[in-house]
Amino acid sequence: MRFTDAHAPGPLCHLSRYGLMTGTYPFRTDISVWPTKPVIQEKEDTIAKLLSRQGYQTAMVGKWHLGFRETGYDNPLPGGPVDQGFQSYFGIRASTDIPPYFYIRGDKAVMPPTDEIGDNATDGWSPIQGEFWRAGGISPDLKLDRVLPRLTAEAIEVIKNRDEEKPLML
């Protein structure tokens, strides 16, 4: 797939992600606020479902931020990427400023957020100052300043371990 002229369907990350995943303008739905529950309906088609039906291997690595049905950290987290056509997923439920912070593999928490992290914001904080996060639960295996390198390593593993007989959508 080659994108030569792309436009964001919404002004926020989850709105653009919803538009990319479903092909639907986000203003045609009720997802204008930060999602906590799944915003893609179970029967709604997604780019991952479409490509899977065409024989693609589909994997997602990164921030989902389209909601999960959170049922506890020891249970599956339905409504995420593996329920929307991705054959594998590794990532985080929202951005690194929205606790609780924990990695998800497939539809399960890798490690529950049993620790706490303090807020690192200061008065007058601006993006020029660097990383920002809010206080909340965090899993012992997640370091907020190491999320991007971890996601990069996971994406590299997907590429290395792909089925070379099938096209890959990552």
What are these regions (language model features)?
Residues 1-170:
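Formylglycine-dependent sulfatase
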